[in-house]
Amino acid sequence: MRLTRRKARAVGIAAGIALLGLIGYWFRTQLTLAAFDLFFSGRVKAQLEQSYQPIVRPAPESGEASVRKEESPEEAAADADRPFTLLLLGIDSRGNERGRSDAVIVTVVRPRDAALLIVSIPRDTRVDIPGRDKPDKIAHAYAYGGAGLAVETVGKFLDLDIDHYASINFRGFREVIDAIGGIRLPIAKDLVNDDPGHEHFVVKAGQPFYNGEDALNYVRFREDAGGDASRAKRQQIFLRAILDKASEVGEWRKIPELIDIMGKNFATDIRPDEVLRLAERMLAGGSRAVYSHTLKGAGRMDGGAWYFFADERDAERVKAWIRAWLDADAKLRDLPKPDPAESA
């Protein structure tokens, strides 16, 4: 879906690194990027150092695991405009448990064009998870093996190499939403989650703003006719609602609080210097373009469990989009894009 100029100005890289993008927006509109560098970049970098968690990846030739080779700062700077893939994981965990990736979003970032392609994969999608003896839900990959296995699983499913990941605990979103005074959500009727096998809650319709708890329950709601696909679309609405509210609040004094929230709930294998450089690159341009799509398919029981079966034609279309978007020489105007009507 193509955003308006006002909305796109708030996006930055937030669809891929949501909390940093939200912070970056405020610096652009309230203090400018120069003031950001002067007053807050050191604090942000310190929190990013805390959040930097490279993952161990299998080395195909030796069969032994290894950490992805890091580029030197010079190599990274020279490669700053290269399109790359980012797997965004929204983690729903309670207490000290690892949790599952309730949001699985593949993003192609084109820094030179300040453009994003976002593909949401329903969490119950039936896939082959490396190391497991039978197919399972894509959300379970993170529970079994953390970000590394999630990256490997999604890459295998879409026949591509995932360059980077970013994971955000949903409790971090809740704290962000409360810090900015709630968000607007298009809830026309009460959402009642009361199935015996589900967490019980009610989200009242028609509220002017929804607090963090209600907003997360909006994302977690499971009992509508659209099932897992509807849930994935609500995740996109949820992210956009956070960014829309951020564009209105404009209170830069809240930024230190948001930086602290980011440090506690955010993890990525992108080095801190690269994150800051990418944020500045994406924020320094004019209007930005964000195109989104939710993988099509249907849900049904299989082997005693409920799965979402991806539509093969749509999955092939998504793979073709991603390959095209990763072509650094391609012009944005010539790239295939999702139909906005399909993402509404």
Residue map of PLM features:
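Non-catalytic, solvent-exposed segments at the cell envelope interface
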Residues: 2-344
